[in-house]
Amino acid sequence: EYGVSIAVENHSDATSRDLLMMCETLDSAHIGITLDTGNVLSVLEEPIGYATRLMPYLKNVHLKDYTIHPTDEGYRIVRCSLGEGVVDFPDLLALIDKHHPDITKTIELGAVNARHVRMLMDDYWAEFPDRIFTDMLPHQRLFWDNVRPRDEDWRSPHERDEADEVLAAYETREFEESVAYLKGIGVV
């Protein structure tokens, strides 16, 4: 009636198949997806495959990047400037622009604290009982090609309780680096 759309964001608890099922079930031009390019790593998928599966329903994109740090229980994803992490933005954005040339894209630097993806623990899988293993293969390739050294300090200035001026400089630097990266690949 009002021409308003709802674009559900893929947070750390929804696979691409979950969101595809939601969109297909609701079957409305006013229901779609906000693709967060970093959040897909929390559900053991990789951004290009995730976007491809949901392409007909994309309405908005949050540009976010993460580095991957192994743990005994799985891995941590740690925010970083765009282009410094594992997301292949040139290929991903070319794919999205091919199908949605006017889609809104915003920089979202991400969580101030690392997210711990405990994929090696049984309780992680309780949330995803019907996962299809082949959906996770591209993620595993991405993981193993980009995993950081186990002894690398992954903590952000927020997690180290740095002073406010250090936090402000960190936030500004990551934003400016992200904008420069997007300019460098011709997005801005």
Language model features with spans:
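Generic enzyme active-site microenvironment
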Residues: 7-9, 34, 106-108
